[in-house]
Amino acid sequence: MKKSIPFLLLATLQLSCGSSQEKPEVMQTEEKTIELAPKEILAEAYQLFKEGNDNESVVLAEKVLAIGKETKNDTLIGRALTSLCRNAQRNLDTNRLAELSEGLKLLSETSGNKKWMMYRAHQNAEMWRLVGNLERAEKFYIESMELSSEIGSKGMFMIDHFNKSFVSTAKGDFEEAERLISKYYVLRRELDSTSEDAYGLIALCYLLEQQKNYKGAHEVATVTRRLFKVQNLFPEPPDEKPLLEVEAKVKEELEASLFEEIAKNSTSKS
């Protein structure tokens, strides 16, 4: 398995540079009847969340939730609940997540729309991965992927290959982790053959670090940080946590001179 890592490293680095690219959007197929203002409010709430401003993000999401309930707009209610689920990640508020999850479950039951159960599963998987409960996270990722495959949500199906790879890596199943990362890039090209992605590199550097390939992990982590800075992207909590762990570990394991040399060389790599 180790022999295939350089190829995966090269392929992912080549696919990861270029124009600005957010973490793949997984809510692209909403109803066209959503009012423009609430959509813009939710977009701002998401941006504030990524920047770490959860208080203001929550205020905006709660505003949209109120609008959704008042107008009986299932899409606004579901998207607002999903946004609030993300906000619960920062403080690992699993009680709040459970409350919001019930809201998504009820919405799915009353509307007959399984996508809200898909978002519920995805948000629970993200939280439990962040908490460190790998078995629970994996269970929810599997549920999310089954639902996204069933209802044809290609964006969610793609991104959960990326997400689930962290669980496989942490459990020591490197072969499965590499399969998931490779599949993520295949699915990404199928959705948009022209887009470039920096996000997938987080999964790769975490895999390399867990395999004790500290040089490779440091190189990929450095490129990842540079691309995020250039593209003005903000990793979400479940994804930044392993990146921070990699950065701390490689600094601990590599000699200072080698650490600096790799960092210097990687600043111009793509």
Protein language model annotation of sequence segments:
Residues Q21-L36, H218-S270:
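C-terminal non-catalytic interaction modules
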Residues E62-A66, E102-E109, I142-S153, S182-E190, ...:
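Amphipathic alpha-helical segments of tetratricopeptide repeats
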Residues E35-L36, T75, K115, G155, ...:
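Residue signature of alpha-solenoid helical repeat architecture, marking inter-repeat boundaries
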Residues L15-S16:
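C-terminal motif of bacterial Sec signal peptides marking the signal peptidase cleavage site
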Residues K32, K72, G112, G152, ...:
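Structural signature of alpha-solenoid helical repeat scaffolds
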Residues P38-G52, G78-L92, W116-G132, I159-A170, ...:
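Tandem amphipathic alpha-helical repeat scaffolds
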